[in-house]
């Protein structure tokens, strides 16, 4: 149990008090609470959400209400908080650039094979956004932001461009990159929507 500031009459023979810092959610993020204790969980995610469970605040499981920026009194021994950025973040498919968030550390330029048999490397910059009320769904389904990148974004973007490259010549990518970029943006936006992730833009970088 968490005791907030104030005076308390406690029996030291039965209780032990430990002072710990409050959980801080920085600006630009929300916190998704995963509680390992609490009232028996009752899924309130609805019939449309079939890839996880969401519960009311205070129940055992992933809370449907996120924590907004500020300090929150939580017992971190029985609760875990996953931070989810709510600002637009750029994920760089290149070894040249790594975002300050660190989610794209393991992403590299895509190695593609064109219709006319040329192999080339393609840099892609994917901009995504997760709404604050969608964050609990994302965490319930995938567990963490890093899993969003590794298990969803990387295969979707990589497979699209690998399949697309086999339909075009290398010259098509070099001379009509804006068309290839628009096609990719439309596909990725539709694919990520089913994961409650918004694809803001898909940008093509260097082609080498």
Regions found by a protein language model. Give the residues of each.
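N-terminal hydrophobic membrane-entry segments
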Residues: 1-208
């Amino acid at each position: 149990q968490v005791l907030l500031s104030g005076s308390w009459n406690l029996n030291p023979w039965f209780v032990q008090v430990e002072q710990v810092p409050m959980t801080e959610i920085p600006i630009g993020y929300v916190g998704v609470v995963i509680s390992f204790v609490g009232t028996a969980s009752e899924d309130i995610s609805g019939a449309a959400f079939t890839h996880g469970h969401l519960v009311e605040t205070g129940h055992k499981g992933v809370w449907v209400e996120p924590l907004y920026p500020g300090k929150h009194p939580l017992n971190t021994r029985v609760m875990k908080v996953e931070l989810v950025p709510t600002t637009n973040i750029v994920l760089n498919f290149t070894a040249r650039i790594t975002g300050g968030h660190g989610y794209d550390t393991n992403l590299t330029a895509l190695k593609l094979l064109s219709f006319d048999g040329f192999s080339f490397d393609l840099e892609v910059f994917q901009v995504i956004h997760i709404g604050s009320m969608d964050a609990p769904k994302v965490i319930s389904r995938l567990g963490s932001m890093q899993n969003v990148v590794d298990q969803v974004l990387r295969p979707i973007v990589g497979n699209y461009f690998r399949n697309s490259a086999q339909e075009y010549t290398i010259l098509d990518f070099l001379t009509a990159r804006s068309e290839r970029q628009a096609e990719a943006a439309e596909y990725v936006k539709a694919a990520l929507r089913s994961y409650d992730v918004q694809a803001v833009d898909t940008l093509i970088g260097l082609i080498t």
